[in-house]
Amino acid sequence: MQNQGQDKYQQAFADLEPLSSTDGSFLGSSLQAQQQREHMRTKVLQDLDKVNLRLKSAKTKVSVRESNGSLQLRATLPIKPGDKDTNGTGRKQYNLSLNIPANLDGLKTAEEEAYELGKLIARKTFEWNDKYLGKEATKKDSQTIGDLLEKFAEEYFKTHKRTTKSEHTFFYYFSRTQRYTNSKDLATAENLINSIEQIDKEWARYNAARAISAFCITFNIEIDLSQYSKMPDRNSRNIPTDAEILSGITKFEDYLVTRGNQVNEDVKDSWQLWRWTYGMLAVFGLRPREIFINPNIDWWLSKENIDLTWKVDKECKTGERQALPLHKEWIDEFDLRNPKYLEMLATAISKKDKTNHAEITALTQRISWWFRKVELDFKPYDLRHAWAIRAHILGIPIKAAADNLGHSMQVHTQTYQRWFSLDMRKLAINQALTKRNEFEVIREENAKLQIENERLRMEIEKLKMEIAYKNS
């Protein structure tokens, strides 16, 4: 996907360190994208100053300015047809919009156009034509959604640093915009909103709006999608208990027994990788993608890894972190540090093109396929929710649990508090009552001990008095 034209944009991002964590929320992702857009805008404005210095040095009576994501030519010109000559000079200062985007390529185009306009002014041959009246720009605006989708990647990475994470985000935006819009429709706000309105499912509509919003920002299409910005209520989930998780992992061995003999020799042992993946999701509460993006296998198997942490790579959704296990004994019970399984992981990843996010996504989707294959009653992400709920029940502070899962405290509480099932709530309440009962017992025993201590103190005082009396 990269070429020389794109290189200069990525070079402009060389001194930018993107926010290491988006906190897992849409707001966090938006702030990260905004940081990168502002960084690129600063670079463009710096280069714009240089362009205007060159134009001034060449005594060109034209300057370039930025306005709302576009570049305009500013010059004093003959009165435009239909305009009033308020000063009586026959001339007036105008800002000409030629549909030039405010990016590095646009600066080059704008500078060339400024020199061309300057020559017309100097020769006194300027005339108001379709180009300078903005009519050609209007024609250019009449592009279809399909036309813009073809240029989406090129334009998107003019304002975003290219990383594994941003490639994945772009794939998300592109695929949903392509899926939910008609490529033959003109790329207008009205048509894009109509596309969203035709989506029946609430979550699909919400996700489509997020993607189309990014599409519109990229192509400077004015659109109001605020009515679709509220996250829908979550559907109910089947969050597994610890007992169900322990039972679930045995279903992979059950599959081995029941699958039959007609199995391709190359994949006959592949179930072991997905059993291992199941175990890692359960123990660490990982996002499925965090297993497959640049896994630090050497660290996982290292003797120095005494805390048995899994290192999540910086290219993942919320940056790098070390995830700690809950139920550390499951690591041995599930045989998660067996080099054989890690070798299978490395082999599976090596067969994929890391720059092709459809292929990485295919790996994570394969987990869901195996969950259905072995007839588990829950989904991969439910193991992450189970980790969060288990942490809460065990009394782990919200901040520590949120950090371990790689998101903010706000996301943690908003996301996971709602998943407490009746059984989970009963367990949490019973454990709290048990702790309270234990406290009451200790308090009663302490009160009894205080009474006994007071009785013994008085007994000692009495004995002292008797001894003193006998010796007198």
Swiss-Prot record:
Keywords: DNA excision, DNA recombination, Heterocyst. The active site is at 287, 317, 384, 407, 416 (o-(3'-phospho-dna)-tyrosine intermediate). One of its GO terms (molecular function) is endonuclease activity. One of its GO terms (biological process) is nitrogen fixation. InterPro entries: DNA_brk_join_enz, Integrase-like_cat_sf, Integrase_catalytic. It comes from the Bacteria. Residues 244-429 form the Tyr recombinase domain. Coiled coil: none annotated. CDD domains: INT_Rci_Hp1_C. This is Excisase A. Belongs to the XisA/XisC recombinase family. It comes from Nostoc sp. (strain PCC 7120 / SAG 25.82 / UTEX 2576). Essential for DNA excision. Site specific recombinase necessary for the excision of the 11 kb nifD element during heterocyst differentiation. SUPFAM superfamilies: DNA breaking-rejoining enzymes.
